[in-house]
Swiss-Prot record:
A GO CC term attached to the entry: extracellular region
The protein's name in its UniProt record: Putative uncharacterized protein DDB_G0290419
Signal peptide: 1-20
Places the protein is found: Secreted
Taxonomic superkingdom: Eukaryota
Source species taxonomy: Eukaryota, Amoebozoa, Evosea, Eumycetozoa, Dictyostelia
Keywords associated with the record: Secreted, Signal
Length: 104
């Protein structure tokens, strides 16, 4: 479900940003930029939620330690990680579809 929502969101952003056809490289760049911006936003949210001093601690912890160290934020961290992974996957699918359409 998250993948479909992410795919639709990316498609909407890309359609709104250019009304004509754009090259596959431009599509790839825009899509990857969108995911990178989402990752930066997620990092900012995480920093805000747990505090800047705990970010390094989080990065050094194994996943099970996450639950113990930051139980109140664990679910949000996992959800954001899944969203970012689905963003990358949605980008790849969108680019593959564009390549397929280009060669037809």
């Amino acid at each position: 479900m998250k993948f479909l929502v992410c795919l639709l969101l990316i498609a909407a952003v890309l359609i709104n940003s250019a009304m004509g056809s754009f090259s596959i490289l431009a599509l790839k760049h825009q899509c990857k930029s969108y995911c990178a911006n989402a990752e930066n936003y997620a990092q900012d949210l995480l920093t805000e939620a747990v505090g800047a001093e705990n970010i390094q601690l989080i990065q050094n912890h194994a996943e099970n330690d996450f639950k113990n160290s930051f139980p109140q934020h664990y679910e949000k961290i996992v959800e954001m990680k899944e969203y970012l992974e689905s963003c990358e996957h949605a980008c790849d699918s969108l680019i593959q579809e564009e390549i397929f359409n280009y060669f037809q």
